[in-house]
Regions:
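Rossmann-like NAD(P)(H) cofactor-binding subdomain of soluble oxidoreductases
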Residues: 62-66, 79-111
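NAD(P)+-binding Rossmann beta1-loop-alpha1 motif at the extreme N-terminus of oxidoreductases
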Residues: 1-58, 65-78, 99
Length: 111
C-alpha cells in the first residue's frame, strides 16, 4: 500500500516514521511518503534525516520518502496513493481539504 502523510509537524512525522518502521520490519509492505508544505523544511529533513524542530531525537528511516513545497509537489505526492493521511494543524485543514477536493484516494483526517 502506498501511503502519504501530509504535514511534517510532530504528529505527521511520528505517524510517517512509525509506518515506515513497520514496513522496514516486515510487519507491513507499505511505501510511506512524508509531505511538508515548505521546500526548505524538506531539504532539512533530507539532509539531517530527522525533524529536529518538531520531533527531535527521532531518526527518519531511510525508507521514508520526503516531498514537499508548492501545489505541484502536493499533486505529485498524492498521485497514485492508496491512502492519504492529513496531519496538519486544524487551522490549515480547511485549505488542505479544498486543495484535495478532487482526489479520489481514501483520506484519513487526524486532528
Amino acid at each position: 500500500m502506498k501511503i502519504v502523510v501530509l504535514g511534517a509537524g510532530a504528529w505527521g512525522t511520528a505517524l510517517a516514521v512509525n509506518a515506515a518502521r513497520a514496513a522496514d520490519a516486515g510487519v507491513t509492505r507499505h511505501q510511506v511518503t512524508l509531505w511538508a508544505r515548505n521546500a526548505a523544511q524538506v531539504q532539512s529533513l533530507q539532509a539531517e534525516r530527522a525533524n529536529t524542530r518538531y520531533l527531535p531525537g527521532i531518526a527518519l528511516p531511510e525508507s521514508l520518502l520526503l516531498q514537499g513545497g508548492g501545489e505541484a509537489s502536493l499533486a505529485h505526492a498524492v498521485s497514485g496513493q492508496d491512502l492519504i493521511i492529513l496531519a496538519t494543524p486544524v487551522a490549515a485543514a480547511r485549505g488542505m481539504l479544498q486543495r484535495l477536493q478532487h482526489v479520489t484516494a481514501p483520506l484519513a483526517w487526524l486532528s
